[in-house]
Regions:
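Internal, active-site/partner-interface "lid" segment
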Residues: 383-403
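Active-site diphosphate/adenylate-binding microenvironment
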Residues: 43-54, 65-75, 269, 398-462
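N-terminal alpha/beta PP-like core and its mobile active-site loop of ThDP/TPP-dependent enzymes
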Residues: 2-385, 432, 436, 441
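Short coil/turn segments at secondary-structure boundaries
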Residues: 202-205, 389, 446-449
Length: 462
């Protein structure tokens, strides 16, 4: 009897999946009359359908007894051609692959693991997802909701939802304790992974007893769609004019470009000219203005360049655009010793108010800069193209930096006592790889953490 039920369930799922595949999506299948708005399903199938509505079609998986039911649903929907699964050897690798996919192509993916150690491996890998602000779903098998005692593969403690607490420290998380809570969980997930300014990992914990739970007459229209909207420009209240006056008064303007400024290249370029400022960039936005741009002083901070750190140390006004002020960028609060005022443009309130004596402009970076540039044009007292002492000083430092790097590229090897011969230096090796990647046009570089990462910041010339 049980085998008959399982076989019938698989057949029903496959038929439904084929209808969706043929129609091109859930909404199209409903519109064609081939799929009812209300279906009898299980939580795991409804979850896969909900993720499909959010255009999640790729799953990187290391399955186990904690994810048996979700794995069965994925098997059926892959057979129908609706989704694709990729079995990988390690959960951390799955996490990194999903992160890279979102970063390079913008495509969303989900990482699926079993209960306990596997989930912990993927959780460790999600640090990259969180650090780089990229939206990825994580589906972890979880202990049952019946509290029959600690699960031997999870945290051995008599307390509820310990993995939920753990995951909530890295990003947003939700335990599917009740099948009908699925729409709420998926809306929170959608708002997290498609956040317009800073995405992140979203952890869905799937208790083993709720994964196969039936959902009778479930309304597919409850599955959330629609990405969260972006902000407009920061509210005025006279602050644009106030900021423009502060910029016009300053003698040495530096613009710190963080990840939130990656889509504001033209507006930043115009601002630099109007403000007679120079830019220092975070590694995330290498290329937001070209390396060759005369006002681009490249990276600054504890792993910065000669010219970037000079601009950071000498500036009297800081304009921060989409920056989080991580320890490496502002040298653990020792940077900007001569800055007297900060204009902080950010979509996040906490980041926008990070520094004291700051004028916070909370809004979209590009839209806010457009309004600030309009205000600056009214305040401008220096003719465009004029080369100030500040500009010439920074240009000279960039020339010094380029010469410093050239010396090391011209001597690409050093004698190494361990290897007993000449060994390629790290800057030279990275330079060769970066130049080759750029020459190919479509090759992406990923840098490991630590000193490789630091030299990568300094070598790349996007």
């Amino acid at each position: 009897m049980e085998e008959d039920f399982v076989s019938q369930l698989a057949a029903t799922r496959l038929e439904r999946a084929k209808v969706i595949a043929a129609a091109g999506g859930i909404d199209e299948a409903i519109a064609s009359g081939q799929l009812s708005e209300r279906i009898d399903t299980t939580l795991s199938e409804a979850l896969v359908l909900g993720l499909l509505q959010q255009d999640v079609r790729r799953y990187l998986v290391v399955l186990g007894h904690g994810s048996t039911e979700i794995g069965e649903v994925l098997r059926v929907y892959e057979e129908a051609g609706v989704i694709q699964t990729y079995a990988v050897r390690h959960e951390t690798a799955a996490s990194h692959a999903a992160t890279a996919l979102r970063w390079v192509t913008g495509e969303k993916a989900a990482v699926v693991t079993s209960i306990g150690p596997g989930a912990m491996h993927a959780f460790a890998g999600s640090l990259a997802t969180a650090s780089d602000g990229l939206g990825v779903y994580y589906l972890f098998g979880d202990e049952t909701t019946e509290d029959e005692g600690p699960n031997m593969q999870q945290i051995p403690k008599h307390e509820q939802h310990l993995f939920l607490k753990l995951c909530s420290t890295m990003g947003n998380a939700y335990c599917l304790h009740t099948p009908l809570s699925l729409p709420t969980a998926l809306r929170r997930g959608l708002n997290t992974i498609d956040h317009p300014y800073r995405g992140g990992p979203f952890f869905l914990l799937l208790p083993m007893n709720t994964q196969p739970a039936s959902m009778k007459d479930f309304n597919l229209q409850e599955l959330p769609v629609g990405t969260p909207p972006s902000l407009g420009p920061a509210q005025d209240d006279g602050r644009y004019q106030q900021a423009a006056k502060a910029v016009a008064k300053a003698k040495r303007v530096v613009v710190r470009i963080g990840g939130g400024g990656r889509d504001a290249g033209p507006q930043i370029d115009q601002f630099l000219e109007l403000a007679d400022g120079v830019a220092i960039t975070s590694p995330l936005v290498s290329g937001v203005i070209p390396y060759e741009h005369p006002r681009n002083m490249t990276v600054a901070g504890s792993k910065g360049s000669i010219c970037g750190n000079h601009a950071q140390d000498r500036a009297d006004l800081l304009v921060a655009i989409g920056s989080r002020f991580v320890c490496q960028s502002d040298s653990s609060r020792t940077a900007y010793p001569n800055v007297e005022q900060v204009i902080n443009i950010n979509a996040d309130l906490e980041a926008a108010t990070h520094y004291g004596n700051a004028m916070a402009l909370v809004g979209d970076a590009a839209a806010t800069l457009e309004k600030l540039n309009e205000a600056l044009e009214q305040e401008q007292t220096v003719a465009p193209g004029t080369q100030s002492d500040w500009f010439r000083e920074c240009v000279a430092k960039k020339q010094e930096w380029d010469s410093f790097k050239a010396e090391r590229y011209n001597q690409p090897t050093l004698q190494d006592s361990v290897w007993g011969g000449q060994v390629l230096t790290q800057p030279a090796a990275i330079k060769v790889a970066a130049d080759w990647a750029r020459s190919q046009g479509d090759v992406v570089n990923f840098f490991d953490a630590g000193d490789v990462q630091a030299n990568g910041f300094q070598v790349v010339e996007d």
